[in-house]
Amino acid sequence: MNAAATKLPTQLGSIHFVGIGGIGMSGIAEVLLNHGYDVQGSDLKASPITERLERLGARVFVGQQAENLEGAEVVVISSAIKPGNPEYDAARLRGLPIVRRAEMLAELMRLRSNIAVGGTHGKTTTTTMVATLLDHGGVDPTVINGGIIHAYGSNARVGQGDWMVVEADESDGTFNRLPATIAIVTNIDPEHMEHWGTIENLRQGFLDFVSNIPFYGLAVCCTDHPEVQTLVGKITDRRVVTFGFNAQADVRAVNLHYRAGVACFDIALQSEDILIEGCTLPMPGDHNVSNALAAVAVARHLGMKADEIREALDGFKGVNRRFTKVGEVGGITVIDDYGHHPVEIAAVLKAARQASDGRVIAVHQPHRYSRLHSLFDDFCGCFSEADVVAIAEVYAAGEDPIEGASRDDLVAGMIRHGHRHARAILDEDDLERLVREQARPGDMVVCLGAGTISAWANGLPARLSDLDKTAATG
């Protein structure tokens, strides 16, 4: 057998990405470009991501049509691309290989030893933290992430080292195709159930994910989460390192407190009987400290020293749309966050409470009617850390409305669940009126969601700019 045939050939012809501007697709495209492959793709509109890919040498078409495939030899799609898409149909008609995003990612991973970061929540931040620590430790990893890493200005980078760090997306089950050497599991919650169907299937999916690691690999698991603790009990014939706040975790955070939104803590490496004292993470949130512990477990496994770990955590620059401060006007801080699942929303608002001396005003745009419907009671109860909650219209993401799962249904449900100040808002003008009416210096406005709410958050400081003048003259 020719061993070279088991790796991605260096000459594939033009690789066409349908939806090249997507956060999952663009990272793979960027790494392929950096490896010298001929890359092209299409998206429905231009964006900073597509413009960056063009600067790196990709050909990008705005709009999707069959003619875009001229010269293409391979077509890469995400799970969102279905029959009926003109480029998908044209590829089928021409007999071109159609490759799912995860399959192409898996081929890239075969070129390196790999760390795959899985879990319902925290994947993107944890991937960034692993990359940050390994970068600081001289490992120089290649990284493919599901969010823009502030330190890189991109969701991908090509390193010269032997390791690759990737975000493993469980949404369509294809993360089980990734050939991970080290697999991280942050948590397991019901999400993407349109694919998994049952919680038992979801559990099996994560068991398959960690079971794919080789005998010399490592599973890094958060045993603060009951589902992950159960998963650990099912892992056989593979090494496991646990992390969390609980007393049994191999990598444990202790003495945690917050100063001006900065997490201060020590890390107990219990199997080594070592305490890494005086660690700081320049962002609030117990969930972010937990994510950092996963990165520390990997860094320690790869030989990083305690001082290097401490320095890397202190210099962590974060990820776009993960508790990102987009402005401060008149003493009012505006935060943009991707959180769109009740567990994520609760964690982000708890972090906001830790970071703010004033009140917390939450603004949420529900993402998909199906998610709101299936987790309705959880959504009604996840805003308890916010003093004021405003709910925007549901971002449908192509779905049809579901009875009982609307903006107004959620507001009414929150009030029934005991929230004192929940209301509906219509648009950006309504948001501005709400903030002017409710917010005071020292308060924090947290905009949450996976849809267009990010644009609202980023535009809000300019809309409130006169408040700075009022504060200065007052």
UniProtKB/Swiss-Prot annotation:
Primary subcellular site in the record, as a coarse category: cytoplasm
Record EC number: 6.3.2.8
Database matches in Pfam families: Mur_ligase, Mur_ligase_C, Mur_ligase_M
Catalysis: reaction(s): UDP-N-acetyl-alpha-D-muramate + L-alanine + ATP = UDP-N-acetyl-alpha-D-muramoyl-L-alanine + ADP + phosphate + H(+)
Binding-site positions, ATP: 119-125
Listed pathway(s): Cell wall biogenesis; peptidoglycan biosynthesis
EC category: ligase
GO molecular function: ATP binding; UDP-N-acetylmuramate-L-alanine ligase activity
UniProt cross-references to InterPro entries, sorted A to Z: Mur-like_cat_sf, Mur_ligase_C, Mur_ligase_C_dom_sf, Mur_ligase_cen, Mur_ligase_N, MurCDEF_pg_biosynth, UDP-N-AcMur_Ala_ligase_MurC
GO BP terms, alphabetized: cell division; cell wall organization; peptidoglycan biosynthetic process; regulation of cell shape
Gene Ontology cellular component annotations, sorted alphabetically: cytoplasm
UniProt keywords, alphabetically: ATP-binding, Cell cycle, Cell division, Cell shape, Cell wall biogenesis/degradation, Cytoplasm, Ligase, Nucleotide-binding, Peptidoglycan synthesis
Entry's localization field: Cytoplasm
Similarity comment text for this entry: Belongs to the MurCDEF family.
Functional summary from the UniProt entry: Cell wall formation.
Protein name: UDP-N-acetylmuramate--L-alanine ligase
